Amino acid sequence: MTPERKEKLDRVLSKRQPDVTIVLENVFDSHNISAVMRTCDAAGVQDIYILNTKIPRHKKWGAKSSSSAAKWLTVHQFENAEECFRELRKSYSTILTTHLSDNAVSLYEIDFTRSVALVFGNEHSGVSDEIREMADGNFVIPQVGIIRSLNISVACAVTLYEAFRQKNNAGHYNGQRIDDARFKELFKEWGGREEI
């Protein structure tokens, strides 16, 4: 490995944010999933959860959309909502779904300096009632147009870059946030040598 490559892997890993994640529930289009993965990588989100309770497990992602982002992320696939939420609760203190409801908060009211998992539903019906009941609340992306929805990959990008803005302002990208063991594990997975 060249010194430049090692430096790049070190730099990227030191900016990974262990306290924010994306959950995609029954998203049909693999290209949408891939576009979300690309945004996760760009914003420093390491873990992404794919929950398929109504559709078959995804075997591949849309390569053109992801620019191979999947190989740099830790993808957790679940077919059972309870199991998925049990895992999420181990790492994230709050789980919010994207859903237009009376009690939904604005994206800009979320404190992204705290631990949070963000659930996005499928392209046709959004987040299911089951998942909304299991979550801690709902949020919406403020809009002023006629159509009150965004493509899932666009909604995810808007959301993650608000998280990025807040976390950047709070200094979360200024130093390593993942623990040393995870840093070394990912470095090795990404093709680095054992000694860091």
Task: Place the predicted regions along the sequence by residue.
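Post-transcriptional modification and biogenesis factors for structured RNAs
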Residues: 1-196
